[in-house]
């Protein structure tokens, strides 16, 4: 059984990577971070990913997972918000294999964080339907059913009251609109009640920086489904990418 995998998390400002102990979900050694190139074209970002695995000295045969701030359908990105638009319709599996010299497993960054929370974090040992949401500028999401990830769910783009849910209920909008915790909680109530109605989940896990202040908003929500804060936070993307790559290589 594979004991070690590599996770690479591509973000708008930085490309981060680390080797992960698959038994514990912890980093082996230090994380590498290289600023995201500008412009963040596919070739430029792939070159940085190569630098990351070279600095980590990732051996041939070690699974590599790479996260993107976009959906990834069968290795192809249909649209891109946070990197260069030249990523649209790129076969990222083929691109990364060309630059890294080996196959990778590509996935959405929220999917990676969600599967990490189920494998090693707040939802470890929990069965049933787990809905993970990450709060930030928008709302990322992952749905895991009895340990199996349903990819590219994009629950932040559910239409609620005539607009994308994340345009009302993200923590980014809380900051932008100067909402207090009670005002924001009213919007969260509308959003999570809708998700609860659609999916009837067994557990909500909420990530993103705002989850560190969970005691200020979670008690204000009235949901049938239990809600808990994420545990892994800054390591979740890399850990989830590594775990998912090991499961799917």
Language-model-detected regions and their locations in the chain:
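ATP-binding/phosphotransfer module of carbohydrate and carboxylate kinases, centering on a glycine-rich
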Residues: 1-63, 72-79, 92-104, 116-131, ...
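Glycine-rich nucleotide/cofactor/substrate-binding loop typically near the N-terminus or early
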Residues: 68
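Basic- and aromatic-lined ligand-binding clefts that recognize polyanionic substrates
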Residues: 139
């Amino acid at each position: 059984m594979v004991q070690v995998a590599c996770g690479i998390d591509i973000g708008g400002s930085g490309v981060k990577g680390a080797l992960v102990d698959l038994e514990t979900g912890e980093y082996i050694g230090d994380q590498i971070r290289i600023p995201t190139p500008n412009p963040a074209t596919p070739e430029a970002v792939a070159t940085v990913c190569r630098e990351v695995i070279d600095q980590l000295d990732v051996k041939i045969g070690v699974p590599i997972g790479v996260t993107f701030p976009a959906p990834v359908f069968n290795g192809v990105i249909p649209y891109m918000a946070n990197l260069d638009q030249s990523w649209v319709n790129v076969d990222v599996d083929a691109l990364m294999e060309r630059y890294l010299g080996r196959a990778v497993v590509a996935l959405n960054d929220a999917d990676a964080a969600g599967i990490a929370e189920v494998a090693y974090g707040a939802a470890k040992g929990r069965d049933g339907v787990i809905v993970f949401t990450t709060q930030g500028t928008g709302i990322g999401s992952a749905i895991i059913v009895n340990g199996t990830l349903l990819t590219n769910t994009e629950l932040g783009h559910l239409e609620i009251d005539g607009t994308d849910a994340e345009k009302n209920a993200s923590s980014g909008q809380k900051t932008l609109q100067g909402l207090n915790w009670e005002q924001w909680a009213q919007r969260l109530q509308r959003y999570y009640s809708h998700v609860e109605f659609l999916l009837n989940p067994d557990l909500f896990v909420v990530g993103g920086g705002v989850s560190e202040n969970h005691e200020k908003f979670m008690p204000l929500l009235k949901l049938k489904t239990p809600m808990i804060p994420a545990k892994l936070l800054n390591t979740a993307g890399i850990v989830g990418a590594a775990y998912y790559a090991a499961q799917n290589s």
